Regions:
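Extended repeat-based scaffolds of very large eukaryotic assembly and lipid-transport proteins
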Residues: 1-115, 119
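Alpha-solenoid HEAT/ARM repeat scaffold
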Residues: 5, 75-76, 106-107, 137-139, ...
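Amphipathic alpha-helical scaffolding segments comprising HEAT/armadillo-like alpha-solenoid repeats
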Residues: 53-65, 85-98, 117-130, 149-163, ...
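Alpha-solenoid repeat junctions
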Residues: 70, 82-86, 112-117, 144, ...
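Hydrophobic core positions within HEAT/HEAT-like alpha-solenoid repeats
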Residues: 79, 94, 108-110, 126, ...
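Short inter-helical turns and helix N-cap capping residues of alpha-solenoid HEAT/ARM repeat scaffolds
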Residues: 100-101, 132-134, 164-169, 199-201
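Histidine/lysine/aspartate-rich catalytic loop segments that bind and position anionic ligands
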Residues: 131-149
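Alpha-helical oligomerization segments
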Residues: 168-219
Length: 219
């Protein structure tokens, strides 16, 4: 773990020098991709997962892993590597649900379908889909067809109607249409009509794409 911690500290020092007096969430853009040491981080991360056991570390000791996963939110290489190590993935998901950084949570939520323990994956999904962060919850909803297809219609209706993320509601509704299409729900036609009534441009474009696919032979 020491090698990985050293690489994480190098990244932190670079970010502090490059963006003084700013915290990660306030910098904006794809600033993390400007770091030239990611290959060393990736190598140290994979080495740690291969050589060490998550149960040998406390939550505080593993906090740097969550931090660096969150910072790799553009390429998602660390999250993908983590998802290929099931025991580690479960441990870090538990930690992520208690963390304050949504950039780690959405990456893990979007990889739940790859878990070997489907019961555990569904438990995580129920937590992530109700996450207070809009994007985390939306990415979790998109996992629903693979893990809990029988819950898609209920959650699609909830996402469509809820107003806790009013400024992002259009995207919430696009996700609802997507999952209804994925499970071939008989409710899809009703929600396509609702999209037309809504009238917002991205939502209309999403509905049009779905309608186009439904008109193809064999659809």
């Amino acid at each position: 773990m020491n090698r990985l911690l050293v690489e994480i500290e190098k990244f932190k020092k670079w970010s502090e020098l490059t963006f003084p007096c700013r915290i990660a969430g306030d910098i904006g853009g794809e600033w993390e991709t400007g770091y030239n040491g990611w290959d060393a981080v990736y190598a140290a991360f994979e080495e740690a997962l291969n050589r060490l056991r998550p149960e040998d570390f406390t939550a505080d000791e593993l906090a740097p892993l969550l931090y660096i996963i969150a910072r790799d939110n553009e390429c998602e290489i660390l999250a993908q590597t983590l998802s290929e190590h099931d025991v580690w993935f479960v441990k870090v998901c538990h930690l992520a649900l208690q963390s304050s950084d949504p950039e780690a949570r959405w990456q893990l939520a979007s990889r739940l379908h790859g878990m070997k323990d489907h019961d555990q994956a569904r438990r995580f999904l129920e937590a992530f889909v109700r996450d207070e962060d809009e994007y985390v919850s939306r990415r979790a909803l998109l996992e629903m067809p693979a893990l809990q297809p029988d819950r898609v219609e209920d959650y699609a209706a909830w996402f469509w109607d809820r107003d806790c993320h009013a400024e992002r509601q259009e995207y919430q509704r696009m996700a609802a249409l997507t999952v209804l299409e994925d499970v071939h729900s008989p409710l899809l036609e009703e929600y396509l009509e609702r999209a037309r009534s809504d009238g917002r441009p991205y939502l209309l474009s999403c509905a049009d794409r779905i309608l186009s696919r439904r008109k193809r032979p064999g659809a």
